[in-house]
């Protein structure tokens, strides 16, 4: 018991815990995405047809608004909050201020990460519409329908934000 009261032992235990935590954190690498495709369907929630539709939307938005909506489907966030996991992916993927990231966790929940410009420009009504677009289908397990409806709504939101910025 005296050994546990020693500062040297306490410091050694602290170092071991910090190193172990750091190694554990580093071992969980984010899923990868191909630049300019922005769809990483690791959980297999989306059909090829849906993925192609999403890519078409992104190409159009990138040309018109310099914006994309990246999509990540995962089986788990590895005990991270969806918000933190989405932020990590957004940073790792190099998403910009005009972009959004839709994170879908299979059988669990989703999270939408907004780029700084979107977050500052979109109205509360527009953000509510984005949320409402995905809710029902997503929680009914209709991931294709939920994702496509989110993109349709995002198309309207991007157009409205573009009109507001041109005024």
Indicate residue ranges for each PLM-predicted region.
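A structural boundary signal for the start of the first folded domain, especially the loop/turn
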Residues: 1-167
């Amino acid at each position: 018991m005296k050994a546990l009261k020693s500062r040297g032992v306490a410091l050694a235990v602290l170092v071991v815990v910090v190193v172990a935590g750091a190694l554990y954190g580093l071992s969980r690498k984010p899923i990868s995405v191909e630049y300019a495709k922005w769809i990483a369907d690791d959980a297999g929630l989306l059909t090829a047809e849906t993925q192609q539709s999403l890519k078409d939307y992104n190409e159009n938005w990138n040309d018109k608004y310099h914006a994309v909506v990246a999509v990540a489907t995962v089986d788990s966030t590895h005990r991270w909050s969806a918000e933190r996991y989405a932020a990590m992916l957004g940073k790792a993927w190099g998403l910009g201020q005009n972009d959004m990231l839709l994170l879908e966790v299979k059988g669990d929940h989703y999270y939408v990460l907004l780029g700084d410009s979107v977050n500052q420009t979109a109205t509360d009504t527009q953000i509510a519409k984005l949320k409402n677009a995905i809710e029902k289908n997503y929680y009914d397990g209709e991931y294709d329908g939920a994702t496509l409806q989110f993109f349709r709504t995002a198309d309207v939101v991007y157009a409205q934000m573009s009109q507001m910025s041109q005024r």
